[in-house]
């Protein structure tokens, strides 16, 4: 019986380790979900911002020039986002119209 008891004791430790591993896996899954929402345009914007910061740190730009460039980058990408939203909304309206047409018939 002592052999059975010694075998049973490590099991709770293994279970705790497994639980910790599962928790870490869940955290990684949660973090992975955040990265899946980053679009190519978001990455491009971040790269341009990084280039501006790099030039600013090398004293190739003044602070005012950098601010202007940051604003330009933000504006160009916000316009692109608005266009995407409009495109996404159009199919939704089309679906609603189809449903109303079916209801009329």
Swiss-Prot record:
InterPro entries in the record: RNA_pol_Rpo13 (IPR021985)
Catalysis performed (reactions): RNA(n) + a ribonucleoside 5'-triphosphate = RNA(n+1) + diphosphate
One Gene Ontology cellular component annotation held by this UniProt entry: DNA-directed RNA polymerase complex
Pfam families xrefs: RNA_pol_Rpo13
GO molecular-function term, one example from the UniProt record: DNA binding
Basic and acidic residues bias spans: 1-10, 70-80
Alphabetically ordered keywords of this record: Cytoplasm, DNA-binding, DNA-directed RNA polymerase, Nucleotidyltransferase, Transcription, Transferase
Subcellular location: Cytoplasm
GO annotation terms (biological process): DNA-templated transcription
Disulfide bonds, paired cysteine numbers: none
Region annotation (Disordered) ranges: 1-35, 70-105
Top-level lineage group: Archaea
EC number(s) stated in the UniProt entry for this protein: 2.7.7.6
Biased composition (Basic residues): 81-97
Family (UniProt): Belongs to the archaeal Rpo13 RNA polymerase subunit family.
Quaternary structure (record): Part of the 13-subunit RNA polymerase.
Protein name: DNA-directed RNA polymerase subunit Rpo13
